[in-house]
Amino acid sequence: METRNIKRCEYEIGDVLSRVDGLVILLAKYRDRFFSFRQYANEDLYLADLAKYKRIQRAGINVPKLITHDREKKVLIFERFEEKKALDVLSVEDLKEIYFKQLFNIYRFCRFSKIEIDYMPENYILKGTTLYYIGEEIIDANPKRNLENYGLRYWIYSKEAADHLREKGFAIDAKRIISEEEANKRIVLLSVTYW
């Protein structure tokens, strides 16, 4: 097994979790704990992701903790959660109210910080009673991409959510798909309740 030494800690490197332009995310282990080991091809991408993490964290959004970073080796190491993503849960059952309460808390932090993040449910993990954002996107505030106008529809079993689940390779339960009218009512009710 390959090992990598980052700031006097020796990480056992496992499977490749993701590979995108200029970035490889690997599963890493140190003292019986698992981490996301992010290796960057260039310093600009490394610095951009580090700045993105700091900006999201300053906004008050729960994200996996940055355990360590090494600019020379262009590595960021984050804590790793084994819990299911919100999209995985939605594929088998409706999301519980705790998800929506936490999601609107995140949305509130985004609004106050004048930023938007990716509100699609595959970018969130519920650990205990805390929802964590595990997505990559952070942009300046954009009313067309906010939770109410863009993302919330994918958190309930609407036609859009079913199409999205199908695109991601999940089986669809046609009996669970709610009508457009019911989806709109649910979105308004969630917004009134938690905003």
Each model region followed by its residue ranges:
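A short, low-complexity linker immediately N-terminal to eukaryotic Hanks-type protein kinase catalytic domains
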Residues: 1-13
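Hydrophobic residue at the +6 position relative to the catalytic HRD Asp in the kinase catalytic loop
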Residues: 119-124
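Protein kinase-like catalytic core scaffold
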Residues: 35, 62, 76, 132-134
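Structural motif at the C-terminus of the N-lobe alphaC helix and the adjacent alphaC-beta4 loop
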Residues: 51-62
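ATP-binding glycine-rich loop module of kinase domains
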Residues: 10-50
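Conserved hydrophobic "DFG−1" position in protein kinase catalytic cores
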Residues: 27, 39, 68, 77-80, ...
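Conserved structural core of kinase catalytic domains
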Residues: 61-102
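C-lobe/activation-segment region of protein kinase-like
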Residues: 112-115, 127-195
